Amino acid sequence: MKSTFLFALFVLFLAASEAATDYPTNPPTTPPTPAPTSTPLPSSAASPELVAQLLNAPSELDRIKLLKDNQFVFDFKNSKLGVTQGTGGKTVATSRTNFPAVIGHNVAMTVGFIEACGINLPHTHPRATEINFIASGKFEAGFFLENQAKFIGHTLEAGMATVFPQGAIHFEINMNCEPAMFVAAFNNEDPGVQTTASSFFGLPADVVGVSLNISSIQTVEDLGKHLPQNPAVAMQACMKRCGFSD
């Protein structure tokens, strides 16, 4: 497991150094353009049959024979695979279905292209620990692991990295006036992701109401309808400081 995670870290730094080379650094002159949806963009994917064959291959040699050469490359900059778009930027994530070469290696990766004042909303990865490397810009990031644990928060600049333990609620905020990028590596090819607020409001409304000490079911339902898309636009103070709002 240690060697697998060290490999993930090596890939993370290699990908980040390459991707950061020509990532735009000029401050935007207008606010980020809102996106119509945060659902993954349409993409082709490995067939369920291929995924099953790779998972059940008797050896690594057999697994490699099942893949074409181009299936060992994933283009985070231009890919339409694994993309989630919001008002505050986009994240691009590999998975078994969109990057089948990871199957059997216990690694996965997500790259976040976060706009000025954007936030990768609080979320968890139920099946993986994350190491997050800042490729460009600067982020405020933090996590909360469990009841009675303390909140851990950091300001991370380009070239720095942090760890989010498996299952911890965590976030990344770009509080600056220009785009920023992070590269997240995982020690599981299927790390999973659960956005905290949307998952919470997906529970029965009366359960959510009791949890928030709100007696009105209608109020709970109204709150759930106005959750931001991920990545979202962050605090209004940042928008005002950057000249994006009055």
UniProtKB/Swiss-Prot annotation:
Which residue numbers delimit the Cupin type-1 domain? 74-220
Q: Where is this region: Disordered?
A: 23-45
- Does the keyword field hold Metal-binding? yes
A Pfam family that the UniProt record links to this protein: Cupin_1
Domain of life the protein comes from: Eukaryota
Q: Which residues are glycosylated?
A: 213
Chief site of localization: secreted
Q: Where in the cell is it found?
A: Secreted, Cell wall
- Pro residues bias spans: 25-39
Q: Which residues form the signal peptide?
A: 1-19
Tell me which InterPro entries the record gives: Cupin_1, Germin, Germin_Mn-BS, RmlC-like_jellyroll, RmlC_Cupin_sf
User: Could you tell me the keywords of this UniProt record?
Assistant: Cell wall, Glycoprotein, Manganese, Metal-binding, Secreted, Signal
Tell me which residues bind Mn(2+): 123, 125, 130, 170
User: What family is reported?
Assistant: Belongs to the germin family.
What is the official name of this protein in its record? Answer: Spherulin-1A
Organism field: Physarum polycephalum (Slime mold)
